[in-house]
């Protein structure tokens, strides 16, 4: 498991975080709530490390990291001012902003999108058009859902050609491995789901990346409310500066980042890693 998360962290940290930087200044601690897209996984390791090792505290931020229920939900909570910042799919954020949500991206993690259709290798599916009439699993509020209709259209398919079924996020991979209800594929990220499938005994899935079908987009972004940008730009800059520092540390020391997640979620990951 530790190797799994270390690989995800290394892939995630080879990314761009884009934001304006200013000179170092002393700040009073601000209470900040960060909303993640899902429960903790490898791509979140920089946030976890920054919390555990005091990076955010050093930048005057008292951070409260909350798990989420999908990218759309995470960004929506920022738009509703439940949370100060969100981490999730840029596609989901763009979709919400286009509908009037008062949010903007202030930073990018994973500059290249990782969204894909992941297919069981024993399904007989060789091309994306072979998915016609097949069942595909996903989770409600997942950012990967946003541009799936465009992928289908660019491949010469209609939404009605496939059977999309929502399952809980925690059951997505297990349902895929069991072929639940005849499912042959899931919608997910190349940055974590293939590794999770293999870690649970599954074979390497066949991948149809969205980018192969005309959907080239930024992967995951950090978003905040327009009012934060307008009224407290210094906080936004400090948050991104601290995040950049934390992810740089995670890239240099992925084991520490994995341990930081373990510290937060209760140590089960660290215990399993210790048996490796």
Residue ranges and their predicted role:
Residues 28-175, 180-191, 208-210, 216:
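Short, glycine-/small- and polar/acidic-enriched structural segments
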Residues 23-25:
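N-terminal signal peptide c-region/cleavage motif recognized by signal peptidases
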């Amino acid at each position: 498991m530790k190797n799994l998360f270390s690989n995800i962290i290394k892939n995630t940290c080879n990314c761009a975080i884009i934001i304006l930087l200013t000179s170092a200044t002393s700040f009073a601690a601000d209470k900040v709530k960060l909303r993640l897209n899902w429960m903790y996984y490898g791509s979140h390791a920089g946030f976890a490390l920054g919390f555990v090792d005091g990076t955010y505290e050093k930048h005057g931020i008292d951070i409260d990291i909350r798990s989420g229920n999908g990218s759309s939900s995470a960004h929506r909570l920022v738009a509703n001012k439940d949370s100060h910042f969100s981490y999730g799919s840029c596609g989901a954020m763009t979709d919400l902003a286009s509908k009037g949500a008062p949010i903007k991206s202030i930073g990018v993690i994973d500059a290249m999108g990782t969204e894909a259709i992941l297919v069981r290798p024993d399904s007989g599916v060789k091309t994306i058009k072979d998915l016609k009439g097949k069942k595909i699993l996903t989770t409600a509020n997942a950012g990967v859902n946003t541009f799936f209709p465009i992928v289908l259209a660019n491949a010469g398919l209609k939404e009605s050609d496939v059977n999309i079924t929502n399952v809980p996020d925690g059951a997505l991979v297990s349902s895929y491995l069991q072929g639940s209800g005849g499912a042959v594929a899931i919608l997910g990220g190349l940055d974590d789901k293939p590794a999770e499938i293999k870690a649970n005994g599954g074979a390497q899935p066949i991948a149809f990346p969205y980018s192969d079908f005309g959907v080239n987009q930024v992967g995951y972004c950090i978003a905040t409310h327009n009012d934060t940008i307008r009224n407290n730009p210094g906080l936004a800059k400090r948050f991104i500066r601290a995040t950049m520092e934390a992810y740089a540390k995670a890239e240099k020391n992925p084991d520490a980042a994995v341990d930081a997640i373990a510290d937060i979620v209760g140590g089960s990951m660290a215990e399993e890693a210790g048996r490796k």
